[in-house]
A protein has these predicted regions:
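A short beta-loop-alpha structural element at the N-terminal edge
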Residues: 25-39
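Active-site rim helix/loop that mediates acceptor-substrate recognition in acyltransferases
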Residues: 56-84, 89, 163-169
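Conserved beta-hairpin
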Residues: 80-100, 184-186
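Conserved acyl-donor/pantetheine-binding loop and adjacent beta-alpha core of acyl/acetyltransferases
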Residues: 99-184, 190, 239-246, 258-265
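Conserved GNAT acetyl-CoA-binding A-motif
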Residues: 176-178, 206-217
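Conserved acetyl-CoA-binding loop-helix of GNAT-fold acetyltransferases
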Residues: 185, 191-204
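Conserved active-site alpha-helix within GNAT-family acetyltransferase domains
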Residues: 196, 208-210, 219-236
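Conserved catalytic-core motifs of GNAT/GCN5-like acyltransferases
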Residues: 231-251
Length: 267
């Protein structure tokens, strides 16, 4: 599984639909792409049980709901450990996006950070703080977030911390990894191999670095990752599982070829 030298990947043609015959371009995302990346994510997850629980008033305050997604995309992109990619149709429309982070303190992780350059790292650090302050002030001026169930958001964050420590933090050997922070694809473009092409980007990097890939799979996304060779480490906490489809989704891991797996898959 690989991308062409110019970053393009063509879907197999099909006489049934014009969508399936369009050439798809996978490219590195820029900060200008963040708004559309956010809108794609907001649309993809709009009707999921988790979204309905966290943002019950998203229909009434749709602009705020979209802004959550856009701000998150930008915040991730301003981290020097992050790499973001978009999938575009032949017309240039962003139809999907993926964001990955190179975690750890190993030589490979620091080599990548150094390659970014000191000036760019300083710019990203300053921009991240300015953006954080801007977001705080803007939400304050609007009288706070009207889309959220604040108690649900705090509860969900606590579940994430528990699972993060259980599956990643308590396993020193998993600290050095690429982590898939987000993968979204518009519904009408799903099932055409585009998600695999986006994941191919990080799988090639992980194979080159000799490190694992970790991610949190939704109930719907678990099938894709399984086909790509990811293994399930464990389901989300019982409470989180009750919000999503019970018994589906969870923490998943991918091992590069030749990687010495852990002696135990204990969760």
């Amino acid at each position: 599984m690989s991308l062409t030298a110019n970053g393009k990947a063509n879907l197999a043609t099909s006489p049934k639909t014009s969508i399936s015959s369009e050439p798809i371009i996978i490219r590195r995302a820029t900060l200008k792409d963040a708004p559309e990346m956010g809108r794609v994510g907001g649309r993809v997850y709009y009707d999921t049980p988790l979204t309905s629980w966290l943002w019950p008033h998203r229909a009434k305050y749709h602009a705020q709901y979209e802004r959550h997604w856009i701000e998150r995309r930008l915040a991730l992109m301003l981290n020097p450990r992050n790499e973001s990619y978009v999938a575009c149709s032949s017309s240039g429309q962003i139809i999907g996006a993926a964001q990955f982070a190179r975690l750890g303190d190993d030589a490979g992780a620091w080599k990548r950070i150094r390659e970014i350059g000191v000036l760019r790292r300083v710019f990203m650090w300053v921009a991240a703080w300015v953006f954080w302050g801007y977001c705080k002030v803007r939400w304050w001026l609007e009288g706070g977030d009207k889309t959220q169930n604040k108690e649900a958001v705090e509860t969900f964050a606590s579940w994430c911390r528990v699972d993060g420590e259980r599956y990643w933090g308590s396993h020193e050997e998993r600290a050095s990894r690429w982590h898939c922070q987000s993968l979204v694809l518009l519904p009408e473009w799903q099932g055409k191999g585009i998600g695999k092409k986006l994941m191919a980007v990080v799988m090639e990097k992980a194979q080159r670095d000799g490190v694992i890939i970790g991610l949190e799979a939704s109930a719907k996304g678990e099938g894709l990752y399984t086909k790509l060779g990811f293994e399930l480490l464990g389901r989300f906490t019982g409470e989180a599982g009750a919000v999503e489809d019970v018994g589906q989704g969870g923490m998943m891991i991918w091992y590069p070829e030749g990687y010495k797996k852990e002696a135990s898959s204990e969760m």
